[in-house]
Design a protein with these regions (language model features):
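Preference for short coil/turn "hinge" residues that link or interrupt alpha-helices
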Residues: 65, 121, 136-138
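Catalytic-core "active-site belt" of small-molecule-metabolizing enzymes
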Residues: 1-109, 114-115, 147-150, 158-166
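Short, flexible, glycine/charge-rich loop motifs used to bind or transfer phosphoryl groups or to couple energy/partner
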Residues: 2, 124, 141
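Short, structured beta-strand/loop micro-motifs enriched in basic residues and often containing a Trp
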Residues: 111-119, 132-135
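Juxtamembrane/interface motifs at transmembrane-helix termini
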Residues: 120, 150-151
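Conserved metal-binding segment of the jelly-roll/cupin
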Residues: 128-146
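Extended mid-to-C-terminal alpha-helical interaction segments
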Residues: 89, 121-125, 130
Length: 166
């Protein structure tokens, strides 16, 4: 696809549908009750908007572009996993290209980004009848697709995920 610009490596969470029945305010303490799985994922991204300045906190956490696909890696049962300061990287051995990152680039840590999204869902009174994913933002940034092949993303202590770009 000629509009595909790059890929991002992210932490994603599977949230239980019980979250929508929760009538109290979501917080860091009760947030963990609604997370069933955690996984590394690759987001294949396309067109990006150019934002001029930041007008709100949401601008820092919002993705202003067209996402083409999410590839979710192996899910791990969530057991209060610490993803605050984990090294990450995306590599393509075919073209000898590696980009290094860290999970702390996302709103200090991915759990903060998750909390922000869930608070917004609660505030807007969104309802849904099944479990759902929340993708918490890039730990590596948009890595340009410089060639075809398999791009492998690794988040230390969490796992790896691969996407074939052809």
């Amino acid at each position: 696809n000629k509009f595909t610009m790059g890929i991002e490596l992210e932490v994603c969470y599977m949230i239980k549908k019980d979250f929508f029945k929760f009538n109290k305010k979501i917080s860091k303490k009760n947030l963990k009750n609604f997370i069933s799985y955690i996984a590394p994922c690759i987001e294949v991204v396309g067109y990006r908007q150019r934002k001029k300045g930041i007008k709100s906190l949401g601008d820092l956490c919002s993705d202003f572009g067209a996402n083409i696909k999410f590839v979710v890696g192996p899910k791990k049962k969530y057991k209060n996993n610490n993803v605050k300061n984990l090294k990450t990287y995306i590599t393509n051995k075919k073209i000898n290209h590696t980009v290094i990152g860290n999970t702390n680039t996302v709103y200090i840590n991915p759990l903060n980004a998750l909390l922000f999204v869930l608070k917004k869902i609660q505030k807007d009174k969104i309802n849904h009848n099944s479990d759902f994913y929340v993708f918490t933002g890039s730990s590596v940034g948009v890595v340009p697709i410089l060639g075809k092949g398999i791009y492998k993303g690794v988040i230390n202590k969490l796992g790896s995920v691969s996407a074939k770009i052809s």
